Swiss-Prot record:
Family indicated by similarity: Belongs to the class I-like SAM-binding methyltransferase superfamily. TrmB family.
Gene: trmB
Name listed for the protein in its UniProt record: tRNA (guanine-N(7)-)-methyltransferase
Residues that bind substrate: 148, 180
InterPro entries: SAM-dependent_MTases_sf (IPR029063), tRNA_(Gua-N-7)_MeTrfase_Trmb (IPR003358), tRNA_methyltr_TrmB_bact (IPR055361)
Taxonomy of the source species: Bacteria, Bacillati, Cyanobacteriota, Cyanophyceae, Synechococcales
Enzyme class: transferase
C-alpha cells in the first residue's frame, strides 16, 4: 500500500509544471538494484563504527566550516548545497550504502570537491568521525519515522546522538530539524532541548526552510500541500 501511495504521489508530481531546484543534478541514473526503504540500525551488521576517511583526500579546502547532514538519502540536497556554498564543506552520512555510492558518483560527475558521502550508522560512528568543535552546522531532515512504538528505539535522534553533537559542534552552531510527521519532529526537538547545551532561539517551529533547497521528501510535501514541521536550534 505504501509503495502504491508513493507511486501515485510521484505521478502527480510529474504532471506538474514546477521544476525542482536540483538543476545540474543527474536525476535519472538508477541504482541497478532494489533498495530497502527502511534499514534497522540496531542490526548487528551496523554496530561497528565507521572509521573516518582521510579528510585531506576528501576536501580540497580542509579548513572550511563543515556541515553534517544526518540521513542524507539520495544526496541531492547536499549536492545542491555544495554548489551554492563553495566556501563550506559538506558531509552526508547515510546507512543505505547504495545511496552513498550513487551520491559520490554524482559528486564526481559534477566535479565537486567540497562534498562527500559516507556509509555509516551515525549513532554508532559519530564520535569516532570527528573531534570536539569539528562541526559548524547539522541538518536532520525527514528521518525514518518508525511509527510502531516498539520501533521508536530505531529512530535516529537518540540521547546519545544529542550528547555527541553537543561535544562536536562549535558554540553557536545551528541544528536544523524537519519532518512531515508532527510527532517525530516534536520528539526530535524534545530530545535536543533535554540537553543543556541546546536551545531554541525561536521558542517554537519556523515556517520556512532557511537554506532554500528542499530535500526530495520536502519537495513532495510542498507539491502535495502536506504540512512540514521545522525547527532551528542552536548549540549554546
Amino acid at each position: 500500500m505504501e509503495a502504491d501511495v508513493q507511486r501515485a504521489q510521484q505521478a502527480q508530481l510529474e504532471k506538474g509544471s514546477s521544476v525542482p531546484p536540483w538543476t545540474g543534478i543527474p536525476l535519472q541514473k538508477g541504482l541497478g538494484q532494489r533498495l530497502r526503504q527502511h534499514v534497522n540500525p540496531l542490526q548487528a551488521q551496523y554496530q561497528q563504527p565507521t572509521p573516518p576517511p582521510h579528510w585531506e583526500r576528501v576536501y580540497r579546502r580542509l579548513g572550511q566550516p563543515l556541515h553534517l547532514d544526518i540521513g542524507s538519502g539520495s544526496g541531492r540536497f547536499l549536492l545542491r548545497m555544495a554548489q551554492e556554498q563553495p566556501d563550506w564543506n559538506f558531509l552526508g552520512v547515510e546507512i543505505r550504502q547504495p545511496l552513498v555510492e550513487r551520491a559520490n558518483a554524482w559528486r564526481d560527475e559534477l566535479g565537486l570537491d567540497n562534498v562527500h558521502f559516507l556509509f555509516a550508522n551515525i549513532n554508532v560512528s559519530l564520535r569516532h568521525l570527528f573531534a570536539p568543535g569539528d562541526l559548524s552546522r547539522v541538518t536532520i531532515q525527514f528521518p525514518d519515522p518508525w511509527f510502531k512504538k516498539r520501533h521508536h528505539k530505531r529512530r535516529i535522534v537518540q540521547p546519545r546522538l544529542v550528547a555527541d553533537l553537543a561535544l562536536l559542534l562549535q558554540p553557536g552552531s545551528p541544528v536544523f530539524l524537519q519532518s512531515d510527521v508532527r510527532e517525530v519532529a516534536e520528539e526530535m526537538v524534545d530530545r535536543f532541548l533535554e540537553h543543556p547545551q541546546f536551545w531554541n532561539p525561536y521558542q517554537g517551529p519556523i515556517d520556512d526552510n532557511p537554506f532554500g533547497i528542499p530535500t526530495e521528501r520536502e519537495w513532495q510535501c510542498l507539491q502535495l500541500g502536506l504540512p512540514i514541521y521545522r525547527y532551528w536550534l542552536e548549540r549554546r
